[in-house]
Amino acid sequence: MTGIYIHVPFCAKKCPYCAFFSEQYGRKTVDNYVKAVIRNLQLYQVNDTVDTIYFGGGTPSLLTAGQISDILEACSKYLHLYQPEITFEFNPTGKRNTYLHDIHSAGVNRLSIGTQSFSDSQLKLLGRTHSVNDGIRTVETAFQVGFNNISCDLMLALPEQSELILHETLETLVKLPITHVSAYLLQIEEGTPFSQNQDLLARCLDDDQSADRYLQTVHFLEDAGIHQYEVSSFAKKGFESRHNLKYWKCVDYLGIGAGAHSCYMGKRFYVPEDVSQFCDGEHQTEIILSENPYDREERIMLGLRTVEGVPAEWVKSQKIPLFQKAGYLRIGENGNISLTAEGFAVSNAVISAMI
């Protein structure tokens, strides 16, 4: 089973913490971009069965519901679909009821809402244009129009994010009709406005405080029946992201759009971050990153991001006993090595030391 990722690299406003590729929204450019996406879906001639489609960005909700419908009609026409999970990233501002109803009718069956926080002061700090009330109303409206698989994004370890502020955000979150949470630690990326804001940098949490907020989130969600299955991913039973699991389990996925990455037919490649080139070309350009995309180190690195872990025989590191003693690793009855919640809190350091 193959997954399809459709990248929509347009934003109405760039968030000050974001280092991802995006361009300013323009109607004519977006119209041409959608046509290029459909053209590439036809040209790739994917022979394998496709069971997940993911619209990511950028801000996919800048596309009209009609454009989403056109893309999904092309997917149905040119791909071999089988009971697909179709995820759509949605920004909780502006259009809600009619738009959500229309994309649900078009076939979108999973919504990923960029709430980020349920604290107005923290949303303001992040430069977000929506309020707490906007986030709540978006989730509730999505549920009312028929979405029964709803994920919310949370950002952790924000400047001045106290235990109380995070607790209130988590309390608000779990009262909503959601099935999934993606929770990410704030990363200060070079070249972003955040990286140049000395006042903000002085208010950032240290590593220990960041780990505390992460573990607070893990334990709170677990108590609410939203279980961790990957370092940043939590779900009610049966609602794990089928698309994202492909990344961590080394299953083929094909990215369509400027800046999209793929691991497909034995190659890892990406499309240049150039909207004009993507729109003007008959077929999207592929830049090869690797022709051995799932080597041993890659499988270990990705597998250790999951609660399931990897077979112990894959890992030859002499640091296993040290990390076990520190409470970062465990070896299960099935013989798999996996990270504990405490290990996930420092996963980058632990995983890099293991491969």
Show the residue positions of the predicted features.
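C-terminal scaffold of the Radical SAM
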Residues: M1, A19, E23-Y44, T49-W314
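Immediate flanking context of iron-sulfur cluster ligation sites
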Residues: M1-V8
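Local cysteine-cluster metal-coordination motifs and their immediate loop/turn environment
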Residues: P9-F20
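Short amphipathic alpha-helical interaction segments
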Residues: W314-A326
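A short, conserved structural fragment
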Residues: K325-N334
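Minor-groove-contacting beta-hairpin "wing" of winged helix-turn-helix DNA-binding domains
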Residues: G335-T340
